[in-house]
């Protein structure tokens, strides 16, 4: 037996494993790095987040990614070079974290890397007859493995597509395994660049569980701030939005979109919801001369209404649901206030701290769970193709030499 296979086998047999989860979202804020102690697998999974940090991305990194990110046409040579470069870059960040945490890399069983999404393209979006769903994440896991000396599991989304899914959202697997409850109906709401949710009814019926993208959360607001406000990456404390007024005409135009009418589950991305989308809505509503503050106030409300529509759909199926939110959007208190107002049937809004997981770390933790399932799990019992959930083992293994 090859030593690498033997080591993986021994890791799988251990009662608990140390797994580093990596997540780099479409907001391009930074690399989330979560060191997790994961005990058991499947529905018996238990997690302790030992260390967590977000390593901020430099402007240089963001500039490089934005040259190809969510673009239908880009420089193929540049994209080819970015793939290994991002992997090496992420590997260096992991080494920095291990050094600062004073953790020996030899003690880590595996790294779980999501990579950097460059383009997400479900069939409902591209409309080509000859092709099904597609998604592309860069950041070669071989580069991470070689740079850190740690076996790396990555490229999780491709198996989901191979099994007939859209490659997203994958949160449902970890949410179901770790956050399901027999005491209450739960909605796990992730408020990143794109908002998505996982619906977890308390009856535990896996056929009723689903996960879906909802629509834009931070993606358009952040892009607008970055274009029109120097040296600002997002609307801190919603200060810009609070200084403006909601424009009804623009709000109506923003809400007029085919994706928003589709039933869940569905997926989307910044390929659809971006500044060009906003500009088209402004033109359609003759609101090009609005102040930046009014635009941001309207975008904030638009985001809230899109998310609220999805939450209210869920609560009709499961009364008294409790929402557990995570992601950068939870820090936008104006957005959260809108959600509370628009969702009176929701029993409560909390963040995942209440469930023992830092809301900023949740996605990195979820990919650590997927790696744990790849390594030590059994056949996944969550298999509901009608809801876009394939009962498959995800992840590709990259050895360190």
From Swiss-Prot:
EC annotation from Swiss-Prot or TrEMBL: 2.7.1.170
Pfam families (UniProt xref): AnmK (PF03702)
Reactions accelerated catalytically: 1,6-anhydro-N-acetyl-beta-muramate + ATP + H2O = N-acetyl-D-muramate 6-phosphate + ADP + H(+)
Described purpose of this protein according to its UniProt entry: Catalyzes the specific phosphorylation of 1,6-anhydro-N-acetylmuramic acid (anhMurNAc) with the simultaneous cleavage of the 1,6-anhydro ring, generating MurNAc-6-P. Is required for the utilization of anhMurNAc either imported from the medium or derived from its own cell wall murein, and thus plays a role in cell wall recycling.
Claim: Nucleotide-binding is one of the keywords in the record: yes
Gene3D superfamilies, per the entry: 3.30.420.40
Organism of derivation: Pseudoalteromonas translucida (strain TAC 125)
Protein name: Anhydro-N-acetylmuramic acid kinase
Positions annotated to bind ATP: 25-32
Record keywords: ATP-binding, Carbohydrate metabolism, Kinase, Nucleotide-binding, Transferase
Pathway: Amino-sugar metabolism; 1,6-anhydro-N-acetylmuramate degradation; Cell wall biogenesis; peptidoglycan recycling
Family as reported in the entry's similarity comment: Belongs to the anhydro-N-acetylmuramic acid kinase family.
Source taxon at top rank: Bacteria
One function term, GO molecular function aspect: ATP binding
